[in-house]
Regions:
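N-terminal signal-anchor transmembrane alpha helix
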Residues: 6-38, 173-184
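Small-polar-interrupted transmembrane alpha-helices in polytopic inner-membrane proteins
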Residues: 10-21, 102-120, 169-177, 267-285
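Interfacial helix-loop-helix junctions of multi-pass membrane proteins
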Residues: 24-36, 114-134, 184-195, 232, ...
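Extracytosolic (periplasmic/ER-lumenal) interhelical loops and adjacent juxtamembrane/interface segments
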Residues: 30-73, 190-231
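Membrane-interface helix-loop-helix junctions at transmembrane boundaries of multi-pass membrane enzymes
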Residues: 92-104, 161, 254-272
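Long, hydrophobic, well-ordered secondary-structure blocks that form the structural core
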Residues: 101-146, 150-153
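A juxtamembrane structural motif centered on a specific transmembrane helix
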Residues: 146-163, 308-326
Length: 326
């Protein structure tokens, strides 16, 4: 059991690192730094010698080797592959403990994540795939956290009964907002509006929902986006509106939990509230500072931790039937 706990704990840390590297890869426009998968220009690592670069560019004449982008992509793949091996080890160690639901889900999800990583390249950054890959990473982190807590003794929870059931709509609101954020990033719409509080003057007359939420099938390459400016602005505006709704809903829930609980739930609810305020501030900074790299990566990372903490709260509220609900 100790070995299993250590494996899960290590996987959580590694999953966080993979999420950071994934955001960095995307934000440095390195998603196609290697135009093939799982290698890079036909090599196991980035080609660096002159004759290897010549071979690579002969194989992909439309994709000249950009070493820094290729390394960003390959480092992300190396760490993601290591995470996959750790999760396989978790599954194998879990066989003797007879708790296979979460390990099985984790193994299935990490395999699907690998497939999404491949499709990200082979489908040239299709927005649906990119968004799905991001959501899959967040889900993987949350499931790892759930499994870690499943391996711990169940704490006694005392909260109002209504707060247990309110968890699900609150989680849905947060998940929808994260999906909007992923759609914004995947369609290169983060700088479609650079004024506060909503967008540039006259934005209401430019809203284009049909194009903003179209699947945009049939393009050969989605790098840097295929949407019109009006569609990108629409996506951006909806993400801002969603941010305000999410701030109000999740903050109200976290405050209610904090006021009506103790121990672990009280600590987690305060953590959610602080992460929520930090995330909203990072979003504002992205607009005001025109998407600085470190800030944008942090915005992605805090979102992952926010959903993880909220999911853990939900798990703790539902796991112990002997807990007191009043």
């Amino acid at each position: 059991m100790i070995t299993l706990k250590r494996l899960v704990g290590s996987s959580i840390v590694l999953a966080m690192l993979v999420i950071l590297l994934g955001a960095y890869t995307r934000l440095t426009d390195a998603g196609l730094g290697c135009p093939d998968w799982p290698g890079c220009y036909g090599f196991l690592k980035v080609p660096e010698q002159a004759h290897h670069i010549e071979q690579a560019e002969a194989l992909y004449p439309d994709r000249p080797v950009e070493s820094h982008k290729a390394w960003n992509e390959m480092i992300h793949r190396y760490f993601a592959g290591t995470l996959g091996l750790l999760i396989l080890a978790i599954f194998l160690f879990s066989l003797k403990h007879k708790r296979l639901l979460l390990p099985s889900l984790l193994l299935a999800l990490v395999i699907f994540q690998a497939a999404l990583g491949m499709w990200t390249v082979t489908l040239a950054l299709h927005p649906v795939v990119v968004m799905g890959h991001l959501l899959g990473g967040f889900t993987l982190l949350s499931l790892l956290a759930l499994y870690w807590w499943q391996l711990q003794p169940a704490p006694f929870i005392a909260v109002k009964h209504s707060l247990k059931f309110l968890f699900w709509p609150v989680l849905l609101v947060l998940a929808a907002q994260i999906a909007l954020g992923g759609w914004t990033a995947a369609n290169y719409a983060a700088l479609a509006c650079i004024q506060l509080p909503v967008c540039e003057a006259g934005w209401t007359s430019q809203l284009n929902f049909d194009e903003a939420f179209s699947l945009h099938l049939g393009y050969d390459n989605y790098e840097y986006g295929v949407m019109s400016q009006s569609a990108r602005a629409t996506v951006h505006v909806m993400h801002r509106v969603g941010a305000v709704i999410t701030l109000l809903v999740v903050a109200a829930y976290a405050i209610a939990l904090w006021r009506n609980s103790s121990g672990l739930i009280k600590t987690l609810s305060l953590t959610v509230l602080l992460l929520l305020l930090l995330q909203f501030s990072l979003g504002l900074a992205n607009v005001v500072l025109h998407l600085p790299l470190a800030n944008a990566v942090a915005h992605n990372f805090v979102a992952a931790n926010l959903v993880m903490c909220l999911v853990v709260i939900g798990y703790q509220l539902h796991r112990n039937k002997e807990s007191a609900y009043v």
